[in-house]
């Protein structure tokens, strides 16, 4: 882009003026602007007594505040995802409850003596159960300049559901499931075309709850594998991949309408007929960024049978035989997804006992898929790779998906990082070998793993010219979403955390990106939370348009998240603007 001399001088002038401005901060608890007790009481009254003062979930186990019965419950349930959904003072990844930069944490250890600090846990939670209550909470935060976060089930892996000194809007209480045979979008003038079977859900409906209803009524939706994820929250706002993606597309491809409370407290309906810019943005533009979604209408499909094939590879170490098994699995994924089938493989190259394991699960809906998996079994046999095989025929896919799968991990500390791998790479002659070589070079130790999700290709790619949404364009050429999960040891120090982050950011993720010559897109739901070039990694060429939508609907950044749209203007916790934010704000207008 070429700038005129006049424009260059204008930019320089703006920059000089910016340096003279003070940093803008949200109101903090120690500030005079912090709401009084009476004002918090007024908010509580306006939302029908749903305001909660939050303290860390581990507090009852601290020596200074020890409560045996409550501590017993915390210790027994800390790894239970459903329990954490119901406790707004907790998150699924406990690493986001702590604030290591300030040495603030609250260990879940009986009679802990190291103290218990608030960390990143919000100070208050508005446990809303209606749109009106959401509006009241949003308006309260806006008019008092509070740091606001949106939490549904607490699954967010990049820390977007928590922030120090904040007010939380808890949406898990927004329930309701309404199935219709022929959904008609809302329109203010004229008439809209019916769109076929659909289901409208409250933001707090869990994936497992929706699958269970689908099992009863004979429909299935495109959701994820974790039964405790709020499907209307971060799932669809991150794009949403699932086992039906190769045959149907992404979850966000099938969002027909959303209801959302925006930064000015308005209740908005967005679909293809009205508020189209907002409708485009929330389908892949990131959760907690454009407002509080209160309900979503999803396209529903007829329920169907499926066969789940499990292949377990265990070896004493991650030796040549083990990696040959991984390569063999990778080689069949293109043809598997071509036919609308899918698969996931979770790999632990090293365990505490020294063994290595690869757990493969294939989801087939047709004869072609069965043939592909039979070929995989024969190839493993031919290479002398030991494995255990299981088959599970499911006459009702929704019923199978409704049951917990053991993937709802909770009460753990993990730093994720992900990258898309294209169909062309994996389907090429040397592709599986190149990918396997890169994976074996990651040098993952005990407590760390990677997952290979073959949820791209097929209809995800075919929807490139059919669906106009904010998801990263690389989705439309991707076959795999590859996610590295680095385990963080209990009681970790800031130094340990930074060391793990450095390895992931400067070595492991670059190795994977180098497979295709540089930066590739990443799945927003499991992406690296400190991504420097997050704009490109999460949204690519869509970012500029997303930023314009953000400026139009939330010009003061009431809704801001870590590595979210517009977050480059703010510090990591979204509490204060950066020194150069005035220049950034000015440039955003051009």
Curated annotation (Swiss-Prot):
Gene3D superfamilies: 3.30.465.10
Superkingdom per UniProt: Eukaryota
Residues carrying sugar: 44, 80, 103, 178, 396
Keywords carried by this UniProt record: FAD, Flavoprotein, Glycoprotein, Oxidoreductase, Signal
Technological use: Malbrancheamides have the ability to inhibit calmodulin, calmodulin-dependent phosphodiesterase (PDE1), and induce both endothelium-independent and endothelium-dependent relaxant effects, suggesting their potential as vasorelaxant agents.
Disulfides per UniProt: none
Enzyme Commission number(s) of this protein: 1.-.-.-
Residues covered by the FAD-binding PCMH-type domain: 117-303
Signal peptide: 1-18
Cofactor(s) recorded in Swiss-Prot or TrEMBL: FAD
Pfam families linked: BBE, FAD_binding_4
Keyword Coiled coil: no
Gene Ontology terms, MF aspect: FAD binding; oxidoreductase activity
Family, as annotated: Belongs to the oxygen-dependent FAD-linked oxidoreductase family.
Function: FAD-linked oxidoreductase; part of the gene cluster that mediates the biosynthesis of malbrancheamide, a dichlorinated fungal indole alkaloid that belongs to a family of natural products containing a characteristic bicyclo[2.2.2]diazaoctane core. The first step of malbrancheamide biosynthesis involves coupling of L-proline and L-tryptophan by malG, a bimodular NRPS, to produce L-Pro-L-Trp aldehyde through reductive offloading.
Protein name: FAD-linked oxidoreductase malF
Gene: malF
């Amino acid at each position: 882009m070429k700038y005129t001399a006049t424009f260059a001088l204008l930019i320089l002038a703006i920059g000089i003026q910016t340096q003279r401005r003070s940093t803008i901060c949200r109101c903090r608890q120690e500030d005079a602007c912090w709401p009084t007790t009476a004002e918090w009481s007024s908010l509580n009254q306006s939302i029908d007594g749903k305001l909660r003062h939050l303290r860390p979930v581990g507090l009852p186990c601290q020596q200074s505040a020890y409560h045996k019965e409550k501590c017993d419950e915390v210790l027994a349930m800390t790894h239970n995802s459903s329990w954490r959904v119901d406790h707004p003072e907790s998150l699924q990844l406990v690493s986001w409850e702590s604030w290591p930069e300030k040495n603030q944490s609250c260990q879940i250890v009986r009679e802990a003596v190291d103290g218990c600090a608030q960390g990143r846990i919000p100070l208050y939670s508005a446990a809303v159960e209606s749109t009106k209550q959401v509006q009241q909470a949003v308006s309260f935060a806006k008019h008092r300049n509070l740091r606001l976060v949106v939490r549904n089930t607490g699954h967010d892996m990049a820390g977007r559901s928590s922030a120090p000194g904040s007010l939380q809007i808890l949406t898990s209480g927004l329930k309701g499931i309404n199935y219709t045979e022929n959904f008609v979008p809302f329109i203010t003038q004229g008439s809209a075309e019916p769109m076929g079977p659909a289901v409208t859900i409250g933001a707090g409906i869990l994936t497992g709850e929706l699958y269970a209803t689908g099992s009863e009524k004979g429909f299935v939706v495109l959701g994820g594998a974790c039964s405790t994820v709020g499907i209307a929250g971060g799932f669809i706002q991150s794009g949403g991949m699932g086992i039906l993606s190769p045959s149907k597309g992404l979850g966000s491809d099938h969002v027909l309408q959303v209801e959302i409370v925006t930064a000015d407290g308005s209740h908005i309906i967005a679909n293809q007929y009205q508020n189209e810019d907002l409708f485009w943005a929330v389908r892949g533009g990131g959760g907690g960024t454009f407002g509080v979604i209160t309900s979503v209408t999803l396209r529903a499909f007829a329920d169907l049978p499926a066969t789940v094939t499990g292949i377990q590879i265990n070896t004493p170490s991650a030796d040549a035989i083990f990696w040959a098994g991984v390569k063999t699995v990778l080689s069949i994924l293109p043809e598997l997804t071509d036919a609308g089938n899918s698969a996931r493989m979770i790999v632990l190259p090293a365990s505490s006992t020294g063994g290595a394991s690869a757990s493969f699960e294939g989801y087939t809906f047709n004869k072609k898929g069965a043939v592909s998996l039979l070929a995989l079994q024969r190839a493993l046999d031919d290479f002398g790779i030991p494995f255990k095989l299981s088959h599970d025929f499911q006459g009702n896919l929704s019923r199978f998906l409704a049951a917990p799968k053991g993937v709802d991990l909770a009460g753990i500390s993990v730093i994720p990082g992900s990258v898309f791998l294209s169909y062309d790479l994996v389907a090429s002659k040397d592709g599986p070998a190149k990918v396997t070589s890169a994976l074996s070079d990651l040098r993952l130790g005990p407590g760390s793993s990677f997952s290979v999700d073959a949820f791209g290709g097929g209809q995800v790619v075919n929807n490139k010219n059919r669906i106009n949404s904010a998801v990263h364009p690389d989705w439309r050429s991707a076959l795999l979403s590859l996610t590295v999960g680095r385990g963080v040891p209990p009681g970790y120090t800031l130094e340990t955390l930074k060391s793990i982050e450095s390895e992931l950011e400067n070595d492991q993720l670059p190795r994977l990106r180098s497979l295709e010559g540089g930066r590739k897109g990443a799945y927003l739901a499991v992406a690296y939370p400190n991504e420097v070039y997050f704009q490109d990694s999460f949204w690519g060429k869509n970012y500029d348009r997303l930023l314009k939508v953000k400026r139009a609907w939330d010009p003061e950044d009431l809704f801001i998240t870590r590595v979210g749209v517009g977050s480059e203007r703010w510090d990591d916790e979204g509490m204060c603007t950066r020194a150069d934010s005035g220049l950034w704000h000015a440039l955003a207008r051009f």
